[in-house]
Amino acid sequence: MIGEQYTSIITGFKSALAVSCIAVSLFLLSPWIAYARLPSSIKSPIKAKGPLSALRACLNEISAGAKTSTRGYELYSKKGQSFAMLNINFRPQVILPPEHVRWLVTQPEDILSHAKASDDADALGYIWPLFDASALHSFSKVLQIDLTRNVTQTEKDVLEEVQHIMDELVGQTESWKEVNMVQAFERIMYQATQRVYVGLPLCRDSTYMGYVKGYARSLGTAMVFAAQLTPWPLRQVTALLAGLPVYYYVLRVRSYLSPLFKERMERLKEKGGTQDDNLEGEPRNLITWMSDGVLSGVGPKSISPSEMVTWLGILALLPTDNLWTTCTNVLLDLLSSESEHAYLHTIREEARTVFASSKESGKPVSHGLHHIDSAIRESLRMNSLSPRSLHRQVVRRGGVVLPDGQKVPTGTWLCVLSGNIQRDEDYYEDAQTYKPFRFVPKLTEAGGDKAPLLPLTNEKYLTFGYGRHACPGRWFSFQVMKIVIAYILANYDIQPLEKRPDNIVFADLNIPHLSHIIRIKRMT
């Protein structure tokens, strides 16, 4: 009897061991299996001749940064050829050359899917199993319409918050003070955007703001970990585990915002009437606009206040880290530029002039800040937050033929190297040189004292994407960054830097170090 039990245990152990060995073998073979599906004629800077070399190539990308993709860009993209890359997540990707950008963004969703690629590129569908992309798209229209339409009010709110924070950080005295640049911009951007999203007094509630930052930070971390750093066979499990802090913080944020959404929607329902009549007397913030969007049919037809908090987090809270990252890059670039160019002086004088004229005319301040606008564009061109963009997945049965004649199978990831395109001498004069006023002539010509008409996206400037899936909040983001930088430079003196510090480059991330200390004082 006992012998039979031992035999049964041993048999079970052998079976479990066999299954485990098969699972591990398939896991280790997965990079090669996926890579081998691509046509043998497609070029690659990676020499993956078998399962081990494919696995090694994936692991090497952890520390390679953009080196491998840049080599592929120089070898193949500049010759109009597509090439294949292996990634940390064990899934190969076909990189298209710059000439194919328009073709890529104009393909129908049933041929090249943006939605499918986004599911894998940001892993939201894995972190939130009930993720509804249609609801996200509906609320993105609210960002496009209401945030842009209420530019004057949002500028006023942002200015009040940046003034309030700078008074606390630096004070009213004219003595030099050391400030952590990243921490300063992080606080400014979170609090200023929250002023627009939820209003006073909540945007200055330290406990609430802690939960907001935790929500955005944990969600961003989970997305990077699940989408970029986890081999795709393990993504479902790791996304759920990485999402545990997200679930905690979203519950905390919901405890503050769900009652606000519920109360605002009930009040708007009672008013009835037209959309403009509904908003009369209501706070001009994103809580109101999202609530009105649901009731007016712009947003999803059926959604709870708690769900609205989730979408607010994904659409509005998550991108906030990109704002302070960009502002830090802009200031690092300006402070380390050669003094004879007088970039800071020009921007400071423009900001003061525009602030003064705006008080008299009532026109939005951001419309006249052409030099700051150009400086932000240039820093984003030089320091692309992500080196790849325009992600698409082939969903057409039987695959698709690329413009260069290569046929790739269903399920293949496609993208372009936006970071390399934006620093290519073929598309930008002196592309490797920082020229903060590079875009000023076109901005002045296109905008005058009105909102700049120079697009934030085109085939050679892909920071915010391109085409119908470009970032819906890009104009608002630019407006906020211009206002913040303009106010700081118009009212504060900052000691220049001897050298521009290098950024942290890891996987598809390119961010400043978090410990930059600057010396700053208030100007009379």
Swiss-Prot record:
CC annotations in GO: membrane
Keyword annotations of the record: Glycoprotein, Heme, Iron, Membrane, Metal-binding, Monooxygenase, Oxidoreductase, Transmembrane, Transmembrane helix
Coiled-coil intervals: none
Alphabetical GO biological process terms: secondary metabolic process
Record keyword NAD present: no
Cellular location(s): Membrane
Binding-site residues, heme: C471
Pathway the protein takes part in: Secondary metabolite biosynthesis
Annotated family: Belongs to the cytochrome P450 family.
Function statement: Cytochrome P450 monooxygenase; part of the lna gene cluster that mediates the biosynthesis of diastereomeric piperazines. Lna and lnb clusters encode sets of enzymes that produce overlapping sets of previously undescribed metabolites such as piperazinomycin-like metabolites or morpholine. The lna and lnb biosynthetic pathways appear to be part of a signaling network that controls the formation of sclerotia, a resilient overwintering structure. One primary function of the non-canonical nonribosomal peptide synthetases lnaA and lnbA consists in the reduction of L-tyrosine.
Name of the protein in question: Cytochrome P450 monooxygenase lnaC
Organism: Aspergillus flavus (strain ATCC 200026 / FGSC A1120 / IAM 13836 / NRRL 3357 / JCM 12722 / SRRC 167)
The gene coding this protein: lnaC
